[in-house]
Design a protein with these regions (language model features):
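Enzymes that bind and transform nitrogen-containing heteroaromatic metabolites
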Residues: 1-144
């Protein structure tokens, strides 16, 4: 990624983290136009893990002039963004579905149960599907 940014073929990343990077790593990233965004605020997930709250991440990015972002990740990222506390932050979703097993031992993409009760399911509107090789891309909006 850094080489692509140096060559002018891509933009350098902004890396959001809770840990202060080494001066050397920060300098390497800044030299190509990227930066580390260190957020010390912490939140607890429903599984009891410590994380940075999505609201803090997205507000900080918005303060830097960014109105729309792409967030890449697997089932854990998708589930955390589509959870009841974060779903209002998301307008649209683009998910690549690969022909691999889902569920136990695979990628689990569904809201976790909270104290034995079910949570509302995020339902996409205005969906579009596109096959790309063996994969399928699903696009849709959560809100009108």
């Amino acid at each position: 990624i850094l080489n692509l940014a140096r060559q002018g073929r891509g933009k350098a990343p902004w890396i959001v983290t809770a840990k202060t990077p080494s001066a050397e790593n920060a300098k390497l990233l800044e030299e190509v136009g990227g930066c580390y965004i260190v957020l010390k605020s912490q939140a607890q997930t429903s599984e009891g893990k410590t994380t940075i709250a999505w609201l803090d991440i997205l507000q900080t990015i918005k303060e830097r002039g960014i109105e729309s972002i792409m967030i890449e990740g697997g089932g854990v990222i998708i589930n955390s963004l589509l959870s009841a506390e974060n779903a209002d932050l998301i307008k649209s979703v683009i998910v690549t579905i690969a022909p691999t097993w889902l569920g136990q031992g695979g990628v689990v993409v569904s809201p976790s149960r909270s104290e034995g009760s079910t949570l509302p399911v995020a339902r996409l509107q205005r969906t579009k599907w596109q096959q790309l090789g063996d994969d399928v891309v699903l696009c849709g909006t959560l809100r009108a």
